[in-house]
Amino acid sequence: MLSDRKRAQLERELAKTISSLEGRQAGQLLKILGDPPKLDDITLELWETMGKEMLGVLTPATINTSLLAAENVVNSIPIGVNWDMVNQRAASWASTHNSRVVREMYGNTSQAARDMVADFYEQGLSVGDLRRRLQQRFGPMHSEMVAVTEVTAAAVEGGRIVADELAAEGVTMIESWVTQRDERVCPICYPRDGKVLGDGWTRIDGPPAHIRCRCDTAYKLPPMETE
């Protein structure tokens, strides 16, 4: 589990990097679309290239976040784990997870670009209107939402990797859902706060339970049995 301060730092850093990349990609799209805009040169290869660029941002950031969260869990208990396995699992998860995230992200952006160009002709938009809409699509809010969601996903995965490694050794940890417990907690996550895995939620439910979810998971060893 990450501290609030570390989480905020990781979110800011990732949002800044994503924003820089998306700003450049928005400019590239506008240049290729031309005036008047045409979709002829917006190819699948272009979207794939942009996706690879985003993977280059998300993958190292999420691996780092997962390992930081895993380290925090290990430091909170008197049992160690095979750190090489933790590293391998963090990298494997990041590769699979980020590929899915990027595929969905640029699939949605590709459709949005087609819709914007259609609106340009059907609704009589100006090139300036098109530019503003595209820049909003790639704007700071989008970057922040991606950063918050993916920091949450990576932090939670880091804790789960440690818990699963210990479970393989016969040590079952207690996993609990933890919200930020502030005025921004949503109605989806609020009922799950403090509840252990299996009590109204499964790992499929999250965290993250939704875009911009700021929740985390906490781990502790079960009580020692005494005779």
PLM region spans:
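N-terminal leader/targeting and assembly helices and adjacent pre-domain segments
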Residues: M1-R137, P222-E227
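Acidic, glycine-rich two-metal-ion catalytic cores of nucleic acid-processing enzymes
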Residues: Q136, M141-E227
